[in-house]
Swiss-Prot record:
Pathway: tRNA modification; tRNA-queuosine biosynthesis. Its main location: cytoplasm. This is Epoxyqueuosine reductase. The keyword tRNA-binding does not apply.
Length: 361
């Protein structure tokens, strides 16, 4: 269903009962947790502004766009009174995270990206939830978001009681860790709000800050995206800085290190969503094998996958860095040499860097 523009609507009968029903319906649709937030995000707006002014967003210009709308839901979607925040876990049953990271000839893909793209799946579930609400109360104004618009989803999740923003800047949940996606439904109904998570439970722990391969955390709760492997391998379009390439290791799409070491993730549970299970053995693939994919193979095997966001050229760029950090084996060297004449200058430069790492000129 196409989202309707928000409109004035009478208060629904028995808001508390409706709020509980919304949470029940959300769980029936596969969400593990549902909370309701108001539209005041308080200090989060100032925190975002300081982060932007420091330049920590790198080339993610969209983070600075839209002005105050990002931190003010009622300005982004006029008429919004509440935000329904929902959590869906994504961790596969057999993660192989430590195993793959410890095997330098393997390609490490962030575990959220191993299955189908979460955007479409969660957006569809949000639409279904809106339809269920509409069947109960009649027409109402709503708009669904899944990491695809200027929404401070982590701040909203904290306000809705889904967890707290940890030192690694991710939302943490005492019963579920941090391996989950977030979705939001902006609504024009004055539903009762849930208690905000106004305390954090990281304590003295600094495991996430200490483990970061590229020292991307400038302090607790402060991430410099320009040094973050997830940013460099997914969002960044240029040549990866030379000084960071050896630190990236075999991480070719995203990074999970600050989640892997988080003590709260011992409570993370495997997802029940089949769509989030690994496809094409990407949880245990060889760097050299992936590097030899043609563009047609890349497009075919990443159809409906988050990996499409990088595109073929940056996919090869990332793999070249991984191969440069891999052992000097015959398959590694042959794969790199096969790409020496690749049309993209970006790819060629990373290939030559990788070959020099192996003593090849």
């Amino acid at each position: 269903m196409t989202p309707q523009p928000l409109a004035d609507n009478l208060s629904p009968p028995d808001p508390a009962r409706l709020a509980q029903s919304i949470k029940d319906w959300g769980r029936e649709l596969g969400f593990q947790q549902v909370g309701i937030s108001d539209v005041e995000l308080g200090e989060h707006e100032a925190h975002l502004q300081r982060w932007l002014e420091a330049g920590y967003h790198g080339e993610m210009d969209y983070m600075a766009a839209h002005g105050s709308k990002r931190s003010r839901p009622a300005e982004l979607v006029p008429g919004t009174l509440r935000v329904i925040s929902l959590r869906m876990d994504y961790l596969p049953g057999d993660t192989r995270m430590a195993q793959v990271l410890a095997t330098p000839e393997k390609a490490y893909v962030s575990r959220y990206a191993l299955g189908r793209d979460y955007h479409k799946l969660i957006r569809k579930r949000l639409q279904q939830l809106a339809e269920r609400i509409q069947a109960e109360v009649g027409p109402f104004g709503f708009r669904a978001f899944v990491d695809s618009a200027p929404v401070l989803e982590k701040a909203i999740a904290e306000q809705a009681g889904l967890g707290w923003i940890g030192k690694n800047t991710l939302v943490l949940n005492r019963k579920a860790g941090s391996y989950f996606f977030l979705g939001e439904l902006f609504v024009d109904m004055p539903l009762p709000v849930d208690p905000a998570m106004d305390s954090e439970h990281c304590g003295r722990c600094s495991a996430c800050l200490d483990i970061c391969p590229t020292a991307a955390f400038v302090g607790p709760y402060r991430l410099d995206a320009r040094r973050c492997i997830s940013y460099l391998t997914i969002e960044y379009k240029g040549a990866i800085p030379l000084e960071l390439r050896p630190l990236i290791g075999n991480r070719v799409f995203g990074c999970d290190d600050c989640q892997i070491v988080c003590p709260w993730n011992r409570f993370a549970r495997p997802t029940g969503q089949g769509d989030f299970q690994p496809r094409h053995s990407l949880d245990n693939a060889e760097l050299a094998e992936l590097f030899l994919w043609s563009e047609e193979e890349f497009l075919g095997r990443t159809e409906g996958s988050p990996l499409r966001r990088a595109g073929y050229e940056r996919w090869l760029r990332n793999l070249a860095v991984g191969l440069g950090n891999a052992p000097s084996t015959i398959p590694v060297l042959e794969a790199l040499k096969a790409r020496r004449g690749f049309p993209s200058e970006l790819v060629r430069e990373h290939v030559e860097w990788a070959l020099r790492r192996h003593g090849e000129t």
